[in-house]
Amino acid sequence: MRQPEYSGQFKKDVKLAQKRGKDMEKLKRLLALLIDGHVLPAAYLDHPLKGNWQGYRDAHIEPDWLLIYKISGESIRFERTGRHADLFAE
């Protein structure tokens, strides 16, 4: 089991997702899988990120609802969650 860490921005992103009416159980299921150290099912389209997010991973909760996280040893840091436009806007 990994030790979870939550960024301040992640906590704000969760509140925004709730306001948008997202199904928070989907997010909770994904977080539980990651904290417990399970390999994610292919449906999450989990993959490493590049550029400014190098070292982080991205998993799809829904087609346009993402989770950005980083695994370091026995800890996992949940950095951001939101739409592509929220997370990767230039």
Tell me the role of every PLM-derived stretch:
Residues M1-Q3, Q9, K19-E25, H60-L66, ...:
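Enriched for short, Lys/Arg-rich terminal
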Residues M24-L27, D46:
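A general structural signal for well-ordered alpha-helical segments in protein cores
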Residues L33-I61:
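A short, surface-exposed loop/turn module that caps and links secondary-structure elements
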